[in-house]
């Protein structure tokens, strides 16, 4: 199993087109216009990003946007065990709808789960054709997707993904600040190509609760794109006007004081200048998670993006980075006076 594409539902197609092409480095490889609306298909590396805006109040996109702010309204996967998943969906009485892949024209299925986010599955296809014009700013693949969900739905959702998609829990942790908190599980497919995280709030003041309130229900909090050089990619993105979350004061000094980091292999000045988070997985300074998070795209408590570099095949997620992200979002909420 692996990611196929993300589908972003927006109010203003032209504005989104300019943002993701000029700032994020995606190339529009096709455009589909129907009586339902307009859909642009964008590629960078092996990433497919669909962007749709509605031309009809009766379209799927319009229905989503009447309930939620702009965001990821569909996540699609390629699956090898197509018939098995189809049978399980039928047994669970989940209503599915036939769908045609917007680029390959392969037949697939789509169905709704938490927060009006469509889940779509297609047969496994060959890798996307690439050339230098599709390199963009160096984003290569979809690394992981994060779903925020209410606490009373969390266990059901986790068990569903494990039962139907065959994912397993790789990590779980709780993050707390003096004013907020969350619980998170990191799920992954057997081949490791799909990583899908679930977050739920642990109290009413949690920023996950803020997201659920602003999104009017469960939804995709953020998506991470992989890169082989996060410093180069982030430098390009900043030059193009992409804004990222501010890192808490003292973060880098605290990391430099940690005895397990291999100082010689890290360009601390560049990391601090670009505000990139880092987490060591094996206490050698080699298997590093390097991450950075954009500011929310549609106001506080909505979708944002992540850039991630996994050095020496670093796996999973660093709780230290997760804590720093959580504190950075909380600081932003306070600055904007979000209750």
From Swiss-Prot:
GO biological process, one term: tyrosine catabolic process
Keyword Transmembrane attached: no
Positions with a binding annotation for Fe cation: 144, 222, 306
InterPro entries linked: 4OHPhenylPyrv_dOase (IPR005956), 4OHPhenylPyrv_dOase_C (IPR041735), Glyas_Bleomycin-R_OHBP_Dase (IPR029068), Glyas_Fos-R_dOase_dom (IPR004360), VOC (IPR037523)
Superkingdom of origin organism: Bacteria
Cofactor note: Binds 1 Fe cation per subunit.
Residues of the VOC domain: 2-127, 141-276
Recorded GO MF terms: 4-hydroxyphenylpyruvate dioxygenase activity; metal ion binding
Names of required cofactors: Fe cation
Keywords: Iron, Metal-binding, Repeat
CDD domains: HPPD_C_like
Keyword Metal-binding: yes
Similarity comment: family membership: Belongs to the 4HPPD family.
Record protein name field: Uncharacterized protein slr0090
Organism: Synechocystis sp. (strain ATCC 27184 / PCC 6803 / Kazusa)
